[in-house]
Amino acid sequence: MDDQLRQSALDFHEFPVPGKIQVSPTKPLATQRDLALAYSPGVAAPCLEIEKDPLAAYKYTARGNLVAVISNGTAVLGLGNIGALAGKPVMEGKGVLFKKFAGIDVFDIEVDELDPDKFINVVAALEPTFGGINLEDIKAPECFYIEQKLRERMNIPVFHDDQHGTAIISTAAILNGLRVVEKNISDVRMVVSGAGAAAIACMNLLVALGMQKHNIVVCDSKGVIYKDREPNMAETKAAYAVEDDGKRTLDDVIDGADIFLGCSGPKVLSQEMVKKMARAPMILALANPEPEILPPLAKEVRSDAIICTGRSDYPNQVNNVLCFPFIFRGALDVGATAINEEMKLAAVHAIAELAHAEQSEVVASAYGDQDLSFGPEYIIPKPFDPRLIVKIAPAVAKAAMDSGVATRPIADFDAYIDKLSEFVYKTNLFMKPIFSLARKAPKRVVLTEGEEARVLHATQELITLGLAKPILIGRPSVIEMRIQKLGLQIKAGVDFEIVNNESDPRFKEYWSEYYQIMKRRGITQEQAQRAVIANTTVIGAIMVQRGEADAMICGTIGDYHEHFSVVKAVFGHRDGVHTAGAMNALLLPSGNTFIADTYVNDDPTPDQLAEIAVMAAETVRRFGIEPKVALLSHSNFGSSNCPSASKMRAALELIKARAPELMIDGEMHGDAALVESIRNDRMPDSPLKGSANILVMPNMEAARISYNLLRVSSSEGVTVGPVLMGVAKPVHVLTPIASVRRIVNMVALAVVEAQTQPL
């Protein structure tokens, strides 16, 4: 590596604190009672329960979500036998990947022991601590013996990722590659370069899926592995030794091969060898950092080749992070006693199937303009595909249950998948009541920026989840082109409707209706006609007004207030309401917080604040949450009589009269709103109990500042909204930073609102 990269890597590992992992408590330790519960004397209670029933350890300790990454440093990736201590940064890195991709906690354990039996004894003795063991960077052939003996001795999963992780991903790639070139696994011939742990595991898995052993030829550093080549050949190699036909080199056996599997070293495969391979050959050149052959060189001589490498700068990266976090997730969640062949094969099929699915928006944004539709350049998913956990973990868990190694079977797989989805989409639990209602009676929702990539991704999700009947406004040719480019599987006229914003036969009716609404607001017929042609928000609003759609989402492009001005002009306020307001939800580790008014009213009056607070409470109830409202101010329960504080006090009295059942108090400081003890010091008899979840600000400035500070300062927080309240129709104006998931969430909310709209 160059000097700049080397120094950057060293700085990354040293600052702000050395290393990449830490231990964080999951329980509060703020009081003497907390300490008494966490340690002596309270800790005796779970100890005694575990003594009576060892499975209780999964209930009272972190064991069920804790994996050991264990190595002796004899085969550290790309570095060789550098020793246990020198390999520690790699093991920490593995732990970070477990946590990042599957939420699994890891202790990295570096064992300074080269004797396999002694190493086995050390690892086996650690069984009470962990829910699973990930063996890492242990050289062959010792790794086979170590894994086998540990699997025999231990009643928790033991998984050597260097073997099985590579095998699972490679096998998934081969299955999909064969599908692309229309070849049968039982007929193809494969040549393998390398006979280490990964190569042997790959071959074993492929044979389990139907590849014929007699169609596999293996070459190691001494050439072709044939029977009786040498005395005392390792059993793992001997299992794939072929009859001696006089061929000794890779060049001798590559002629006519359908697949080349490289688990060896750089530049092993030449262009001349590639030329001799069969029609549409598959080349898996997995040596790192330099593969057996670089993809451009292979493509020069065989444009029909499908190529995989271990590198991220070429298509079809075979990366173990595609499987090991999710295999362990599934295994841990059912208390598996092993990771068996059935579980590995389940992972293979889940990974292979995901490559056929529509493109994920997260992956699309991470990989730019790459075409990620299933085909020669995309036969395995990308490592950052958020759907990996919800596809692989359940498949592995079910395989564990079906094969009899699960000690804690999952009773409700739908609920389990929902729980895994929360890891991908932090809003999933929050939105669950809304999604459930939306699915019962999906409504027609017009999305006014239908050509936007985020809107198209959202449309795919809406159809997949069954939440709405989307109507997209945009040019049909552009929408179709972008659907193809994004690798989506939705079809116009089948999954969604398109309204062509350049020419629709209804436009004369639309602009005529828009003119009737706007004619006494300074808009001429000509201006109304231009507005319909130029402004998709106007088109969408008129569609909802005419009953051609039930709800509308706009604002992913452009200024919020320009969109809102159209919404306000076309729809006006709902019955009994004289103002509109906007509210944003922040889903923080400390709880859900709603802030209003973030977008509509610059300086609301007491009457407007009262309406906004009552509407906010109504909206929060839709999420199954009891509203607790605090009116915020620099004044704390009458400490100031300035106009702003007086306004909040006046709003409180209006709210009490209009919604006496509402739990609300004010005016108060922000800390008093969120911390009951602080509030009680100043106002012991406050009707507001616990932490407020709706914060009504004195003006838009305070609301927007507070919202953005909380949004940015909480790295774990996610947002929903803005939710538009008080408009006569179910309409929400989003902002240009809206993610795909936020669009989906707001469409679902609009559907639920439309379900309760009077006809």
Located regions from the model:
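N-terminal ligand-binding/catalytic initiation module
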Residues: M1-V158, A399, A406, K432-L456, ...
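Adenosine-phosphate binding glycine-rich loop
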Residues: D2, D161-D162, L178-N184, A285-A393, ...
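Glycine-rich adenosine-cofactor-binding loop
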Residues: L66-G78, G83, A167-T171, V181-V207
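Anion-binding alpha/beta catalytic cores of soluble intermediary-metabolism enzymes, centered on
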Residues: L85, D137-N184, T407-I410, I417-L759
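A short, aliphatic-rich alpha-helical micro-motif
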Residues: E127, I185, V253-I254, V274-M277, ...
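NAD(P)-binding Rossmann-fold cofactor-contacting core
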Residues: S193, L209-K237
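Rossmann-like adenosine-cofactor binding region
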Residues: E235-A305, R311-D313
